[in-house]
Amino acid sequence: MPEMPEVENVRATLQELVPGKKIDQVIVRVPKMIVATPPDEFVHMLVGQEIEAVRRRGKFLLFDLTNCTILSHLRMEGKFRLMDENEEVTKHTHIIFHFEDHTELRFLDVRKFGTMEVTNKYGESETKSIKKLGPEPLTPAFTLADFATGVKKTSRAIKTALLDQKLVAGVGNIYADEICFEAKVHPERAANSLSDKEINRIFEATKSIMTEAVALGGSTVRTYVNSQGKLGQYQDKLKVYGKTGEPCVICGTPIEKIKLNGRGTHFCPHCQK
């Protein structure tokens, strides 16, 4: 699933491509992908509106239109492509926004897990999807004091806590593994067993890793590309995720993989305690 760095790069490329385009037709080929509003109402609300900006909150893309905002979650395989109206529509194209300039923004999703919903303009914070999201890790709202408070009051594994979008928005499986490794903390450690120094290391690792991942275009470990079809580069920086059996870059101990709450979890058994 694309995490915050990947979604941010999709946002940035879309921001270059679609503002100023006016929607004159919306085609929904898979109705279940439209949530919170009947698909026909979704279509009715969008026709005639102009895209003004593309924002992001956590793993959600936010399209600000003339009178409303669209929330879109890519889930596992969702992708946006800006194409000419005459280009072939593939079988994995499920939602099409047709513009007056004869281009189309197409949403493709092999798994059909992606979702879209429409809300009042700038009203995303009132939706069930977003109202409980925690702070963005690369903003001043992400503070050590609040992060430490959240960590100390849960006995869940620290990796599980990092994946809780109420604690910090946008961290997923890949970056949670990398954060724990950078902080030298075993992913199975109970969050409330961590010392203040360990919590601080995790906090700083979250900021530094997410910053670099955004700068490098995210991680392409499966099929991720941005909305211009470009691969991410941070996968070349990964130290534990997907490295099962490979030597730790610090001590040489083989990286291990376990299941933690159903998630594949990678770590160095020597460096992470």
Swiss-Prot record:
Record: residues binding DNA: H92, R111
InterPro entries: DNA_glyclase/AP_lyase_DNA-bd, DNA_glyclase_Znf_dom_DNA_BS, Formamido-pyr_DNA_Glyclase, FPG_cat, MutM-like_N-ter, Ribosomal_uS13-like_H2TH, Znf_DNA_glyclase/AP_lyase, Znf_FPG/IleRS
Gene3D superfamilies per UniProt: 1.10.8.50, MutM-like, N-terminal
Keyword terms of this UniProt record: DNA damage, DNA repair, DNA-binding, Glycosidase, Hydrolase, Lyase, Metal-binding, Multifunctional enzyme, Zinc, Zinc-finger
Protein name listed in UniProt: Formamidopyrimidine-DNA glycosylase
EC number: 3.2.2.23, 4.2.99.18
Reported cofactor(s): Zn(2+)
Subunit annotation: Monomer.
GO BP term (any one): base-excision repair
Zinc finger FPG-type: from-to: 239-273
Family: Belongs to the FPG family.
Cofactor binding remark: Binds 1 zinc ion per subunit.
Species of the source: Listeria innocua serovar 6a (strain ATCC BAA-680 / CLIP 11262)
Pfam families xref list: Fapy_DNA_glyco (PF01149), H2TH (PF06831), zf-FPG_IleRS (PF06827)
Entry annotation: catalytic residues: P2, E3, K59, R263
Reaction catalysed by this enzyme: Hydrolysis of DNA containing ring-opened 7-methylguanine residues, releasing 2,6-diamino-4-hydroxy-5-(N-methyl)formamidopyrimidine; 2'-deoxyribonucleotide-(2'-deoxyribose 5'-phosphate)-2'-deoxyribonucleotide-DNA = a 3'-end 2'-deoxyribonucleotide-(2,3-dehydro-2,3-deoxyribose 5'-phosphate)-DNA + a 5'-end 5'-phospho-2'-deoxyribonucleoside-DNA + H(+)
Domain of life of the source: Bacteria
Any GO molecular function: class I DNA-(apurinic or apyrimidinic site) endonuclease activity
Function description: Involved in base excision repair of DNA damaged by oxidation or by mutagenic agents. Acts as a DNA glycosylase that recognizes and removes damaged bases. Has a preference for oxidized purines, such as 7,8-dihydro-8-oxoguanine (8-oxoG). Has AP (apurinic/apyrimidinic) lyase activity and introduces nicks in the DNA strand. Cleaves the DNA backbone by beta-delta elimination to generate a single-strand break at the site of the removed base with both 3'- and 5'-phosphates.
